[in-house]
Amino acid sequence: DDRVDFVLADMATADLGEPWGVVMSALAIHHLENEAKKALFAGVRGALTPGGLFVNAEQVLGPTPALEERYARRWLADVRAAGVPGDEIDRACERMRFDRCASVEDQLAWMRDAGLADVDCTFKSWRFAVLSGRA
C-alpha cells in the first residue's frame, strides 16, 4: 500500500523527513533523556503535514514519588497475575533500570512547546499512556 511508509531509524538522530500525515511511536521514547525527548518532539512537529497527527504510546513516570511507587507495585502485580515467570520479570526489572521515563504532564508541556496543538493524554493506565498532538 503506497499510503503507508514504515521507517526504521534511530529516533535520537534521524532526519524524519517530510511531510508525514501521521508519526507514531510505541514504548520507545522513554529510552531518551529529557532533552532528547524535547528535541524529538520538535523534529516530529517539523515533519508533520498541516493537521498531521503525532501519537506516542509510552511508559510514563508517576507524577509524584508515591504514585511512581504505586505504579511499580501495580505493574509487578499485573505481570505476576498474567503468569509471567519470575526470571522474565527479573530481566524486565533490570532493563527498566535504564529507562528515562517522564511524567505525562512534562511530556504534554514539551509537545506544546514544540508547537503541537490539541495535545492530550487520550489513554492512561498506571504507567502506560497514549499522548497525541496535531501540527
Over which residues does each language-model region extend?
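Conserved beta-strand signature within the Rossmann-like core of class I S-adenosyl-L-methionine
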Residues: 48-59
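Hydrophobic beta-strand segment of the Class I
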Residues: 23-24, 111
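Core SAM-dependent methyltransferase catalytic element
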Residues: 108-135
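A short acidic, Gly/Pro-enriched loop at the edge of an enzyme's catalytic core
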Residues: 12-23
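A short glycine-rich, Lys/Arg-flanked "PGG" loop and its adjoining helix->strand segment in the class I
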Residues: 38-50
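A conserved beta-strand element that flanks and buttresses the S-adenosyl-L-methionine
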Residues: 24-25, 55
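C-terminal alpha-helical "lid/dimerization" subdomain adjacent to the S-adenosyl-L-methionine
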Residues: 57-114
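Conserved SAM-binding strand-loop segment of SAM-dependent methyltransferases
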Residues: 1-12
